[in-house]
């Protein structure tokens, strides 16, 4: 049985590629190093079902990655996997560097300013150029917080809290 609590999403299968079962992979981190060294991955389908697959070597292409799976040799088989997230067990991933976090560990954190103003809950993260953007929602507002050292004061995963020092005008938008 697959323990869904220990899984970390590392990418999403966004489209088929060719007729031989290859898929286009959007990597959440922009890297596929961990996928290249593992002997199995878990695919979480759009309906939440979890299935184990053995990946074929990942192929880098301009602006994307291509991946295939053993037993998936035709476009019709691959099409059923489009929209699935590729997940790895936490023990298949490297430990994050100091002041680095996996996105899944940040989602759900309470976010406040260092002065104590509660902003809401970190609900989404997306890449924007050289930094990530944290989407924080609360009290009928949405804040887009850049994940840069000048703004992120501290992250306490055990307490479930992030403190920020907002740049001038950041909270006025």
Swiss-Prot record:
GO terms for biological process: ribosomal small subunit biogenesis; rRNA processing. Disulfide bonds: none annotated. The gene is rimM. An accessory protein needed during the final step in the assembly of 30S ribosomal subunit, possibly for assembly of the head region. Essential for efficient processing of 16S rRNA. May be needed both before and after RbfA during the maturation of 16S rRNA. It has affinity for free ribosomal 30S subunits but not for 70S ribosomes. It is found in: Cytoplasm. One of its GO terms (molecular function) is ribosome binding. PANTHER family: RIBOSOME MATURATION FACTOR RIMM. Binds ribosomal protein uS19. Keywords: Chaperone, Cytoplasm, Ribosome biogenesis, rRNA processing. Its main location: cytoplasm. GO terms for cellular component: cytoplasm; ribosome. The PRC barrel domain binds ribosomal protein uS19. This is Ribosome maturation factor RimM. It comes from Pelobacter propionicus (strain DSM 2379 / NBRC 103807 / OttBd1). SUPFAM superfamilies: PRC-barrel domain (SSF50346), Translation proteins (SSF50447). HAMAP family: Ribosome_mat_RimM. Belongs to the RimM family.
């Amino acid at each position: 049985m697959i323990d869904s609590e220990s899984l970390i999403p590392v990418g999403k299968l966004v489209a088929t590629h060719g007729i031989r079962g290859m898929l286009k992979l959007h990597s959440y981190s922009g890297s596929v190093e961990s996928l290249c060294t593992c002997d199995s991955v878990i695919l979480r389908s759009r309906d939440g079902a979890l299935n184990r697959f053995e990946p074929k070597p990942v192929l880098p292409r301009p602006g994307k990655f291509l991946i295939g799976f053993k037993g998936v040799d035709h476009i019709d088989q691959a099409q059923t996997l489009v929209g699935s997230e590729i997940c790895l067990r936490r023990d298949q991933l490297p430990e994050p560097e100091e002041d680095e976090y996996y996105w899944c560990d940040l989602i759900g954190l309470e976010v406040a300013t260092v002065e104590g103003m509660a902003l809401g809950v970190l609900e989404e993260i997306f890449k924007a150029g050289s930094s990530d953007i944290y989407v924080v929602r609360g009290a009928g507002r949405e804040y887009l917080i850049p994940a840069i050292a000048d703004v992120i004061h501290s992250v306490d995963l055990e307490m479930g809290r992030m403190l920020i020092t907002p740049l001038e005008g950041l909270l006025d938008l």
